[in-house]
Amino acid sequence: MAFFSPWKLSSQKLGFFLVTFGFIWGMMLLHFTIQQRTQPESSSMLREQILDLSKRYIKALAEENRNVVDGPYAGVMTAYDLKKTLAVLLDNILQRIGKLESKVDNLVNGTGANSTNSTTAVPSLVSLEKINVADIINGVQEKCVLPPMDGYPHCEGKIKWMKDMWRSDPCYADYGVDGTSCSFFIYLSEVENWCPRLPWRAKNPYEEADHNSLAEIRTDFNILYGMMKKHEEFRWMRLRIRRMADAWIQAIKSLAEKQNLEKRKRKKILVHLGLLTKESGFKIAETAFSGGPLGELVQWSDLITSLYLLGHDIRISASLAELKEIMKKVVGNRSGCPTVGDRIVELIYIDIVGLAQFKKTLGPSWVHYQCMLRVLDSFGTEPEFNHASYAQSKGHKTPWGKWNLNPQQFYTMFPHTPDNSFLGFVVEQHLNSSDIHHINEIKRQNQSLVYGKVDSFWKNKKIYLDIIHTYMEVHATVYGSSTKNIPSYVKNHGILSGRDLQFLLRETKLFVGLGFPYEGPAPLEAIANGCAFLNPKFNPPKSSKNTDFFIGKPTLRELTSQHPYAEVFIGRPHVWTVDLNNREEVEDAVKAILNQKIEPYMPYEFTCEGMLQRINAFIEKQDFCHGQVMWPPLSALQVKLAEPGQSCKQVCQESQLICEPSFFQHLNKEKDLLKYKVICQSSELYKDILVPSFYPKSKHCVFQGDLLLFSCAGAHPTHQRICPCRDFIKGQVALCKDCL
């Protein structure tokens, strides 16, 4: 929305104008009366003089109000009020000129009836140029031709809402909304960004000012260390950043050489770690040094580091008091419209716990910040659980879903849910330069290392481990006094430092999965050190339908193995996915691993540089506040028809592609499908995660009636799902080949 300094037509200025104008008018009328008998003056000259005076006055006012946008929708007391006033004055003047013109013609040429020269009635100049004052005052003459709404799928729905609800809050009228479609469109394009901007509208001065602030990469951590030093909760993350500092700085310099990091807007970013607040009840920071879960802390520390090195302004919050202090400008604002002026934040990275805290803190203002949210969500949130009313209709009782965000605003640990965005983390290399030289000299021993630091993970796995022990030694890093489930032949090293673990992995040929924990970082670390990973297969796949661990999580995703990412995106010779209960399959895999020689392998997306590249692309390209920005580019779209019983995720994956949910909107009309030779004899709208779809027998198409329900997950029993797939960069799954 454009914001302007209000202009008021003061009574003194108006009075001076009217007195001056009246005096000059009277003198000219007297002069005309005296002179008309001896030297008839042309009425057009008189008209020119009057209009010239008016033009000079209007020009002076225009200079005074140079930055004011005209129109009935620019807000109250702007130049449009002047336009209404002058419309009345000029209409009165033109009417008087018309009467004088008629009298002069009669005096000079005689009456129209006696005129000998006139053969055809000449239209009066006044009638040709007459202004409809009522139209000007009512704004009727303000033509509002709406631009195409392609790429703004929510625009039409928002306009319908405004027609019914614009009187529900006086703030809409303050922004110039007056009940007309044009005023709705201007508000929704300039204030809330749901619609395309009208081409004749001036740009928001605050938006233009924002672009003057550019991001510059950072190559030291001094400022970040100072920020994080204030929080004891950040101790583990701070130590991780220090250990990896050299690798991070080398990575940002390398990325800057490979792609242009100039002319990027410096964003104001809030990072709120809800899981570290006292109110959350979690003890993650306290248990980080005693065997507690580290996955979330790893991801948060890598995210904060990336945002900082990319040159953005970040503010970190780990308490409700800090959150309230940062957002104090909008806390308590009950208006349905956004706060005017400079933005407090432009992006918000948060977790599910923090999301509830943020919504409660902001109150009604929450709605204006929803599009800025990026939610760290390890296991992902599928559209079926994100859509509140749909989740309720399906009987889902998860406490983690029903946020009604764009599903791509949820950021996952691995690229397992294509409806979400893959944030990831960095696999740490715990070695210094002298270690790296030494580690390359280490010879691999005929030994394996079991992935499972808790005794309970080993339960009922002895037969499986016995097979492995037949061919090689079995080592472990189990902590705690309980070892009842660990076979006697296992050599247990206890808890090791990261550096010592790296050396142990370099001596090891096989990293052995037990089936739990699911989707952890350790297998990637082992593969990066040259181990092969024995990845347990799940048949049937594990999900919330058959596994307690997943009950309550906002996903129906099915895990086909302990580590689906390693299974799908890495594979052999680094990853061998086997059925633990199939002795022959396990033996064959172990023998093959012993007979092969493989080099260490690290997917680019799990390196410092890969994460910097991915996060920078998301910051620059992902935009959920301005309609549907076209990213990834449409050039990456490849359309596939799934067979009945097959999801879009599956059909894309079979073709070595990724399902891309942002492309669904381009497959949601009959004319869209014609490009891909899908002809609809009939069609309907339906609100469900399984559409758009096609029934080949009757050539019936079903299109999506609710944009939040577009989903790569879910299979239709009889219809073919119409699926948007895209390619991806090997080692950088989140990005298509044309995305950078």
UniProtKB/Swiss-Prot annotation:
The keyword Membrane applies. InterPro entries: GT18_cat (IPR026116), MGAT5_Glycosyltransferase (IPR052105), MGT5A-like_N (IPR027833). Keywords: Disulfide bond, Glycoprotein, Glycosyltransferase, Golgi apparatus, Membrane, Secreted, Signal-anchor, Transferase, Transmembrane, Transmembrane helix. Pfam families: Glyco_transf_18 (PF15024), MGT5A_N (PF15027). Residues 212-740 are annotated as: Sufficient for catalytic activity. One of its GO terms (biological process) is protein N-linked glycosylation. Signal peptide: none annotated. Residues 1-13 are cytoplasmic. Catalyzes the addition of N-acetylglucosamine (GlcNAc) in beta 1-6 linkage to the alpha-linked mannose of biantennary N-linked oligosaccharides. Catalyzes an important step in the biosynthesis of branched, complex-type N-glycans, such as those found on EGFR, TGFR (TGF-beta receptor) and CDH2. Via its role in the biosynthesis of complex N-glycans, plays an important role in the activation of cellular signaling pathways, reorganization of the actin cytoskeleton, cell-cell adhesion and cell migration. This is Alpha-1,6-mannosylglycoprotein 6-beta-N-acetylglucosaminyltransferase A. It comes from Rattus norvegicus.
